[in-house]
């Protein structure tokens, strides 16, 4: 039909447009091997880990987003959300060497930034804190660990090397190399 989507062409165009997609995917793959004790081989995330797969699809969606193909980016993101249970807005910027462990119920908002070498576990939200528009989501620096169920909300900065405990609610910026846990 005339509305058929040729994913192979979309992916090829995105990879041609942004060569960092493949570099980031390789770094992501290495992150799983290095940080996930259940990952016994490089092929495991490629075939079986929805966090890895969703992240790679996000990279394609983000490429479409910045090339102003926003309806297509949102469509693919919506399908990703339905299939994987992972909701990453196409506008979100995500570095390389990122591990989304399990990834079920993960939400990353439009203006969120995730640095390099970050580990995010399931049921994490990097979201806004209200109805404001514009820059409204967290900025996560390199080397951060965000444990299961944590909620990091608002236009705040989480410094390099921070560890956020499971189930924590973070509403204020966090300096580098500290551990935060709990609910304010």
Q: What residue spans do the PLM features occupy?
A:
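Terminal amphipathic alpha-helical/low-complexity segments used for targeting or macromolecular assembly
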Residues: 1-79
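Structural signal for interior beta-strand "rungs" in well-ordered beta-sheet cores
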Residues: 81-184
């Amino acid at each position: 039909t005339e509305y058929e989507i040729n994913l192979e062409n979309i992916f090829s165009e995105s990879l041609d447009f942004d060569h960092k997609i493949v570099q980031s995917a390789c770094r992501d793959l290495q992150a799983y091997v290095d940080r996930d004790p259940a990952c016994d081989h490089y092929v495991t995330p490629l075939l079986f880990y929805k966090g890895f797969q969703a992240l790679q699809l996000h990279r394609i969606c983000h490429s479409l987003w910045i090339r102003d193909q926003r309806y297509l980016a949102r469509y693919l993101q919506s399908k990703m959300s339905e299939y994987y249970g992972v909701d990453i807005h196409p506008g979100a910027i995500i570095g390389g060497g990122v591990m989304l462990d399990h990834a079920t119920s993960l939400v990353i908002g439009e203006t969120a930034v995730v640095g390099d070498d970050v580990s995010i576990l399931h049921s994490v939200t990097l979201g806004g804190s209200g109805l404001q528009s514009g820059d409204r989501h967290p900025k996560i620096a390199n080397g951060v660990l965000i444990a299961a169920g944590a909620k990091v909300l608002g236009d705040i900065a989480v410094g390099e090397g921070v560890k956020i405990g499971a189930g924590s609610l973070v509403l204020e910026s966090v300096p580098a190399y500290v551990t935060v846990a709990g609910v304010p």
